[in-house]
Amino acid sequence: MIPMEELKVKKITNGTVIDHIDAGKALMVFKVLNVPKETSVMIAINVPSKKKGKKDILKIEGIELKKEDVDKISLISPDVTINIIRNGKVVEKLKPQIPDEIEGTLKCTNPNCITNKEKVRGKFKIESKNPLKIRCYYCEKFLNEVIFE
């Protein structure tokens, strides 16, 4: 049997590294960020982690996340660490927190909600962070799944 070689992923010079993503959720995180298609992205899925057993990692060259993006990530995988990289150095480490309220970003799962019938931006209250329970401000229904706009 041929021994497996360790695959090393190149460091990024400027951009964002999202580490400690729950295993199997990197593609979901990538999708909600709407990264331009010409952007260099590295995704590692189910890599060994001392803290979690397995984790995913996402490296995005040339893009620093906005607060709205960080909020989205916190709803998918709340224990991530986000590192902002400039000139090859970590200049900022972010530990996202699930916000108490969310405006926009999410879509109500109730087909009868006003947000699904008219041009009204969704507004939501986080009732519980663990387990995650989100209530629509307008129809007061709990979301049965997280759907991003």
Swiss-Prot record:
Quaternary state and interactors: Heterododecamer (2C3:3R2) of six catalytic PyrB chains organized as two trimers (C3), and six regulatory PyrI chains organized as three dimers (R2).
Pfam families: PyrI (PF01948), PyrI_C (PF02748)
Protein's name in the database: Aspartate carbamoyltransferase regulatory chain
Single GO BP term: pyrimidine nucleotide biosynthetic process
Binding sites annotated in the UniProt record for Zn(2+): C108, C113, C136, C139
Disulfide linkage: none
Protein function: Involved in allosteric regulation of aspartate carbamoyltransferase.
Any Gene Ontology CC annotation: aspartate carbamoyltransferase complex
One of the record's GO molecular function terms: metal ion binding
Superkingdom of source: Archaea
Cofactor note: Binds 1 zinc ion per subunit.
Swiss-Prot/TrEMBL keywords: Metal-binding, Pyrimidine biosynthesis, Zinc
Family: Belongs to the PyrI family.
Cofactor(s) listed in the protein's UniProt record: Zn(2+)
